[in-house]
Amino acid sequence: MDKVFNVGKLVDFQWKLGVSIASNHSSQLNTPFITVFVKVLDSNSEVTSHSFELTIPEFKNFAQQFKDMSNMIETL
């Protein structure tokens, strides 16, 4: 079994849809993306904020992984 790392407790999860309006590559203009914002409570009771951007296919994969985790938890 894979090792499990305790990285903290997820206390907030937000996302927003954006569209690229400036880029060094014209092929990336008007490309939609998702920005994800998370807040995590660590073992020292400190909240840290993190953000990252995903393409639409990456976000769909990310969302599917959460659905899969939810389904697995429901079977326990």
UniProtKB/Swiss-Prot annotation:
Pfam families per UniProt: COMM_domain
Domain COMM: 9-76
Single Gene Ontology MF annotation: NF-kappaB binding
UniProt GO BP: signal transduction
Coiled-coil ranges (or none): none
Quaternary structure note: Component of the commander complex consisting of the CCC subcomplex and the retriever subcomplex. Component of the CCC subcomplex.
Family per record: Belongs to the COMM domain-containing protein 6 family.
Known function: Scaffold protein in the commander complex that is essential for endosomal recycling of transmembrane cargos; the commander complex is composed of the CCC subcomplex and the retriever subcomplex.
Name of the protein in its database record: COMM domain-containing protein 6
Organism: Dictyostelium discoideum
